[in-house]
Amino acid sequence: MKQLSSAEVRQLFLDFFKEKGHTIEPSAPLVPNNDPTILWINSGVATMKKYFDGSVIPDNPRMANAQKSIRTNDIENVGKTARHHTFFEMLGNFSIGDYFKEGAIVFAWEFLTSPKWIGFDPDKLYVTVYPEDEEAKTLWREKIGLSDDHIVEIEDNFWDIGIGPSGPDSEIFYDRGPAFGDDASDPELYPGGENERYLEIWNLVFSQFNHNPDGTYTPLPKQNIDTGMGLERMVSIIQDAPTNFETDLFMPIIREVEQIAGVKYGHSQENDVAFKVIADHIRTVAFAIGDGALPSNEGRGYILRRLLRRAVRYAKVLTINEPFMYKLVPVVGKIMNSFYPEVENQTDFIQKVIRTEEERFHETLNEGLAILETILKTAKETNEQVIKGADIFKLYDTFGFPVELTEEYAEDHGLKVDHAGFEAEMKEQRARARAARADVKSMQVQGELLANLTEKSAFVGYNSTEHVSEILYLIQNDTLVDEVAAGNEAQVIFKETPFYAESGGQVADKGTIESETGLAYVEDVQKAPNKQNLHRISVKEGVLKTGDTVKLAVDKVKRRETIKNHTATHLLHRALKDTLGEHVNQAGSLVSPDRLRFDFSHFGQITEEELTKMEEIVNEKIWEQINVVIEEMPIAEAKELGAMALFGEKYGDIVRVVQVGKYSIELCGGVHVRNTADIGLFKIVSETGIGAGTRRIEAVTGKEAYRFVTEQENTLKQAASLLKTTTKETPQKVELLQADLREVKRENESLLSKLASAASADIFESPEEIGGVKVIAKQVNAKDMNQLRQFVDNWKDKKIGGILVLGAVQGDKVNLISAVSEEAIKAGYHAGKLLKEVATRCGGNGGGRPDMAQAGGKNPAELGTALDYVSTWVKEQQA
């Protein structure tokens, strides 16, 4: 067997399929681009869905890739098994309507067994097939020459994820030999069984059916091939490693952890699990952050937080008790740099994010662990088998413990956790539902009509907004028609069109279509599968017919305002990087006639000074009157120029480059101004956070910017008029008013304090004595909780002692406060527990510390009854 590094295996795979006429697709970012059905890119085929469902026709039906992927459905198994990972690479080759079973099988066998490529011993390879797939069985026997004892029929060899493409599959296994299993009585010791001897290395999926919504299966218009080979498994075989973790993909990370911990790998099973968890999780977190994800409390951000905290938990097994994960990022970058330079290129930023997250967790971890240990100890002492949901929630809410982390600690002590109770506790406090867990959703059922419309349509709208063209296709209700009459909507493809199809954030053009017999409006334009511009139209007069000569006219006003915003977006993108750092990446955009919206990755808040600086930079470039140069060139040449690419977008060999002087160079298919002076003015309207690590800037240009500035100026003039001052002196006038207001508030609080002191004599007079404890429970007049707290302060000053509960009505609400003296606390009384009981009796809730608590209620009519309960509660505590 050849001795190969992981990088060599990856490159061999891609070189092989390139030689076989495949286009090598770049690895897509882990954060899906325009695919809300999945949390992460979790397979090679996840980036190919648009080709498999027929919504886009690829330039070359043969494709291959090495795709970084994340799957997190088995996190608890990572580190405890030989092959579970949260981050992995999938090598795949794909055919969209080109070669089918024979081609896929022949390619796979050649790559695995040819001395030019991997060079495996054919006798060590076994395959599994779907029992009804006679074609595949025949190919393996007759084309490849496998004997029947190397072909295993398995009922589960049918790939089906619901509605959409499906079909049988054939898996290839490598026999690692008797050392990995030799028990003839083991019912799982066969290719496809649960064992370590026969390792699955490649899955060939023969996508030949549509799984229809009614549950039936019909042949696909085009048969497809989707294959997947796990790089980590393949490398473990080639490098003769007992598990994936002993390969060159993981061992440098493990060696670095050894240095940090002062503990050796391979001497303790418990320690080895910790090493594996850390090595796996740092790869996932580093790549995910590099691709735009950031730790948070929901969605993919929650996954990152959970992985980091799980790694920190296991690091304690290795006696690592301080932030350290960030130190591993350069190691990950170096291992993967030959094919994935993104981690090494962003090392500083990724380290900063991870270190910040680690430091936050360490601040609360030890305190949380102490509480968890108490909870676990109490559960054992009381023979409870389940950790209560309320306890899990407290650890999650106060100390940042993911419920899964608590569950792992509980499992170590032989206990389970109350998931239902935890969810009940979460329900009231959860403001936003967590994002759906990662799983591949059904692809669309393949459609034939648009995919079969192959006549080319040229876009001529970069330099013209009017054009005479011909109607190639008219489509109504998914059917080709010869004509469309007034009052109907349809889809149209023209021979040439000046109408821009929505893409890259730029909205579609609108406008008119005129023929000798009809008039129609263009409402929207999208890309058809074969890359023609597909126009959605409404016919207003007469009739439009296939073959008609038509005059197409784009709405010039809307187009003019749109292109101002598009070029301004490019300037803003560059200004963001110059101001905040090169880590900023575009996460989405909207370019419309009236505004622009730009979403971008950034870890942290943006200051007013930074916003002002960005706005100034963009306006300076506008006023410099820079020519905008647009040209097509090979992508390699564009990269040499330093052109920025849209994050997550895929590009062909020839790309369109938009250059604003030397300041901004981007790959872009949109329409732009000829000179930055055409933009006129740029004004940021708002800046907000829209999710974990994602910010949004909205801005206006040209006349909309002028209107915005004018509105703000008018508002300032109105404020100045009300303040009886000039616009220039308005800020100073407001400061004086604020100072006056603070003084009035101070005087008011002083007066309220005196009134409270005066009222206290009546409130605290003649406390009830219950079992030697002084108890005061009264309704008082207090305008807010602050005044109630003043009553408590007076009670403490008078050293009355015992228990105090006060309630006040404000409109349709109740404010409650309680206090317990030090002596009463020692006797077992608790202000928080008492007030919780009182509050529930007047429609509220709340709680607090043993010495003081406050709460609210929604039923003022029940306040008297609630306060009467205080005496009952005290007596119950004494019973």
Swiss-Prot record:
Binds 1 zinc ion per subunit. Its cofactor is Zn(2+). SMART domains: tRNA_SAD (SM00863). GO terms for cellular component: cytosol. GO terms for molecular function: alanine-tRNA ligase activity; aminoacyl-tRNA deacylase activity; ATP binding; catalytic activity, acting on a protein; transferase activity; tRNA binding; zinc ion binding. Transmembrane segments: none annotated. Keywords: Aminoacyl-tRNA synthetase, ATP-binding, Cytoplasm, Ligase, Metal-binding, Nucleotide-binding, Protein biosynthesis, RNA-binding, tRNA-binding, Zinc. Catalyzes the attachment of alanine to tRNA(Ala) in a two-step reaction: alanine is first activated by ATP to form Ala-AMP and then transferred to the acceptor end of tRNA(Ala). Also edits incorrectly charged Ser-tRNA(Ala) and Gly-tRNA(Ala) via its editing domain. HAMAP family: Ala_tRNA_synth_B (MF_00036_B). This is Alanine--tRNA ligase. It comes from Listeria monocytogenes serovar 1/2a (strain ATCC BAA-679 / EGD-e). The lineage of its organism: Bacteria, Bacillati, Bacillota, Bacilli, Bacillales. The gene is alaS.
